[in-house]
């Protein structure tokens, strides 16, 4: 029985990457832009109903909610060639259409105001599912709507659907270029608190690394949002491929995540993908073997998180877990040989306190999408170097907070009224504790470290109850 997943796209960034994701899914399942199955899509063997449901007129409709506080991006989707794909009852745009002004507090406050309307849509989708497995949230952590309203929805989903999994695809801001959102460090910190406490799994999409990959690997001198979004949609579709083209393992979300996340707080995953191509670069052809793909996935330059730094401290960082999803016509014996070769050459540095093994899921490629390569691979990895990304967010926050800069923008809203800034302090403590925990994972006695925190047992129990299938 398929375990359905409801996708919630929040804010400008969330809706843009969500749109690219649905375009990719339509291509892979042979679904036309209007939601009707293409004449050639007769092979079957795929599970369309994990992400789509079929209407009475045979249209395939995404199990998706499109939410924004300003209309520009959603209007663009409604005027695009995919306008008939979505269920228009599942589109929410705030009446005043003024957005959240890149202010987390505004997005969160409006989340409270509109929660009944949005949760009605969520409940309707959930009631239409036979065996709902969980939710996927697409958003960014730096702006106002995706971060603030996304945070409120995470808390609400966690409360109302406590037994369902919540996975997020969270876009982290570019740390190299100067941002046009001056309060980005505040927004990021407040959102990170919710991602730590209210999500079961966060796939980190780091704009710094995505831009670097587009420049260095794809040779695009000035990558556009559309090009980096196409990288994101590639990762999103590849990470769900075992759910949609099921094999004998990893064919539901619980199965995917249980092996990657041994401890509840350390649930931030980084990704790598190979071979990468964009439309203007299809003429580059090379021989892809399983070993070649698996070796490339471990190379720093293919990893889509910039915290994977080339410093001495980063060399001590360790993998907590790795899952490689290999797509294509692959002989399982090749996989076994490749894993042996990687082990012999000590290409991977694992933690001391858990099994040091790379897990591999084999998946069929979509018969409807032609690619120039025979084998492709996605790596989902839980790696302790991700803490450097959080440390950067903390550092940027401290700079602003020291100067008391832009805090008046937040004091206008109930959570920060009467100069109550305790929410910032609490968020900072939680992220500092997260950084400490990832650092502690690198030592052999991490298990004892976990026992020092009396609240840890409760958190473990909460996650365990979700991972009982």
UniProtKB/Swiss-Prot annotation:
Subcellular location(s) of the protein: Cytoplasm, Cytoskeleton, Microtubule organizing center
One of the Pfam families matching this protein, by short name: Tubulin
Binding-site residues for GTP, renumbered to this chain: 142-148
One Gene Ontology term from the biological process aspect of the record: mitotic spindle organization
InterPro entries, per the entry: Gamma_tubulin, Tub_FtsZ_C, Tubulin, Tubulin/FtsZ-like_C, Tubulin/FtsZ_2-layer-sand-dom, Tubulin/FtsZ_GTPase_sf, Tubulin_C, Tubulin_CS
Sample GO molecular function, one term: microtubule nucleator activity
Keywords: Cytoplasm, Cytoskeleton, GTP-binding, Microtubule, Nucleotide-binding
GO cellular component, one term: spindle
Main location: cytoplasm
UniProt similarity note: Belongs to the tubulin family.
Function: Tubulin is the major constituent of microtubules. The gamma chain is found at microtubule organizing centers (MTOC) such as the spindle poles, suggesting that it is involved in the minus-end nucleation of microtubule assembly.
Protein name: Tubulin gamma-1 chain
């Amino acid at each position: 029985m398929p375990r359905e997943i409801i996708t919630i796209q929040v804010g400008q960034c969330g809706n843009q990457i969500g749109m690219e994701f649905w375009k990719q899914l339509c291509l892979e399942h042979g679904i036309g832009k209007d939601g009707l199955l293409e004449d050639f899509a007769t092979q079957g063997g795929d599970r369309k109903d994990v992400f789509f449901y079929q209407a009475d007129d045979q249209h395939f409709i995404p199990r998706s909610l499109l939410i924004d506080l300003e209309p520009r991006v959603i209007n663009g989707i409604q005027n695009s060639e995919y306008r008939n794909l979505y269920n228009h009852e599942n589109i929410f745009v705030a009446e005043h259409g003024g957005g959240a002004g890149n202010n987390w507090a505004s997005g969160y406050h409006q989340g409270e105001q509109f929660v009944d309307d949005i949760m009605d849509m969520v409940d309707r989708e959930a009631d239409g599912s036979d065996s709902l497995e969980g939710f996927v949230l697409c958003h960014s952590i730096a702006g106002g709507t995706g971060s603030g309203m996304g945070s409120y929805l995470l808390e609400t989903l966690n409360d109302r659907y406590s037994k369902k999994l919540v996975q997020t695809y969270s876009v982290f801001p570019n740390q190299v270029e100067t941002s046009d959102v001056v309060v980005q460090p505040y927004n990021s910190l407040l959102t990170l608190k919710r991602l730590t406490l209210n999500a079961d799994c966060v796939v980190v999409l780091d704009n710094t690394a995505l831009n670097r990959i587009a420049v260095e690997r794809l040779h695009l001198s000035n990558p556009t949002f559309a090009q980096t979004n196409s990288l994101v949609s590639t990762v999103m579709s590849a990470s769900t491929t075992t759910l949609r083209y099921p094999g004998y393992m990893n064919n539901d979300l619980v199965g995917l995540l249980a092996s990657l996340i041994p401890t509840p707080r350390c649930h931030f995953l980084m990704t790598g993908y190979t071979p990468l191509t964009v439309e203007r670069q299809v003429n580059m052809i090379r021989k892809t073997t399983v070993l070649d793909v698996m070796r490339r996935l471990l190379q720093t330059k293919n990893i889509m998180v910039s915290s994977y730094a080339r410093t001495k401290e980063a060399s001590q960082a360790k993998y907590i877990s790795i899952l490689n999803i290999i797509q294509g016509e692959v002989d399982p014996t090749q996989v076994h040989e490749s894993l042996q070769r990687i082990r012999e050459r000590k290409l991977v540095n694992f933690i001391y306190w858990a099994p040091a093994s790379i897990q591999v899921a084999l998946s069929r490629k979509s018969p409807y999408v032609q690619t120039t390569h025979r084998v492709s691979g996605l790596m989902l990895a839980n790696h302790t170097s991700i803490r450097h990304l959080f440390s950067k967010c903390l550092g940027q926050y401290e700079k602003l907070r020291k100067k008391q800069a832009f805090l008046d923008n937040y004091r206008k809203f109930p959570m920060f009224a009467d100069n109550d800034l305790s929410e910032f302090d609490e968020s900072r403590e939680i992220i500092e504790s997260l950084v400490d925990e990832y650092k502690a994972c690198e030592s052999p006695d991490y298990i004892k470290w976990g026992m020092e925190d009396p609240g840890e047992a409760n958190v473990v129990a909460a996650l365990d109850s979700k991972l009982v299938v």
